[in-house]
Amino acid sequence: MTDYSFVSLSGIVIDRVDRKIDFQRGIDFMIDALNNTRGAFLSSGVEDQDRYSRWEFGFIDPPLEIVAHAEQFRLTALNPRGVPLLAMLKPLLLKHPDIELKSENEENLVLTVARPDRMFAEEERSRQPSTFTPIRALMAEFNGMNDEFLGLWGAFGFDLIYEFEQMPLSMPRTEDDKLLHLYLPDRIMVMDRRLEVAFAYEYEFTRRALTTHGMGETAFTGVSQPSSPNMASDGAITSDHSPEDYMGKVDGARERIRVGDIFEVVLSRKYQTAYHGPPSEMFRLMQRINPSPYEFFFQFANEQLIGASPEMFVRVDGDRVESSPISGTARRGDNAMEDAERILALYNSWKDEVELTMCTDVDRNDKSRICRPGTIKLLARRAIERYAGLFHTVDHVEGRMREGFDGIDAFLSHMWAVTLTGAPKRKAVQIIEDVEVSPRRWYGGAIGALMFSGTVNT
């Protein structure tokens, strides 16, 4: 029995079946499944009545994958169910004037997007042709869908900002430098810890003779395994910068600030060490030692993306867009009295106050591109968020989007968090490109979902 049906613009019929599952069993068994299967698991390890709740989401064996690099946008059917789904989506993508077919077969559709041929006004830049053009076409196809969870789930790389803030790139890029990596799942498991309920939402897609009904889920290709799963790491940690080299770049950035080129730039270093255990163990360790609003484990077959973040990037529901800039950090004390002293010191820190003010000013400016005048509001100022080892001071900002703008506009207009780039943002990311030695890849980007309903949660 179908619990919900929707017909898309071109006639794709989506049927959803809702199945209640045992709440006590939970859905974290999917974490172990992700050692060997494509998919994702996202959870919130903290609860805040205004912003965060203790949800868990997961899916495995998605039928369709989207991977974008600088010069191409690839859709891949990952299992037999993905083949008819890819065939349904192909015509609606190819009819877009800015999308061109590069190559195709039954399981792959490789596209290119035309580069902008004109200048766009500040308020229109999120609409210029880009990697998000095919994603917009998909969102337009399913516009009006009343479903909380169906959409594109995955990761968005730092390099996406160079499509919005176009500038010369000085570092070479490789196949590992993705702009985004997304999945379209067809079975999503959701657990609401507050209401103590759990559901599996299962989707079937049909368009004329094409259908996913009765199709198998076995993946066409497997997941890469660690070469020596039982070998222990020696613990050596390496970096792409020596301490002296990094401090030299920091001194150079200070000089740029002194002469007035920028207010702030956030330079990064990449650290790496060998790890030969299952990725699920790493994710569970991170959940245990650093409970966060955004805990994530993406299995991308040739790489795994695991993390825990305290910061909401952009969230959109209807015309409401919100974000939570973070700046100001203090280490937790050994007891309640020490905690109170450190919170007081954090509140009295002029440096932390002005830095958060700057971050929020940039955030409000980002919103002004797409929001109605007078609707951008500060909902919380220097609120204290408590985590396992740290306190953060956080602002909470919302705005109401103007007619004609959507969640993708909100997402693009905010790329990326000032706390990981700098201000003015365009100048800061140019300096990052010029002086860092490794592309940031996923660092400084975002994870989350773009729902077909128009909701964004990143």
What are these regions (language model features)?
Residues 1-458:
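Extended alpha-helical targeting/anchoring segments
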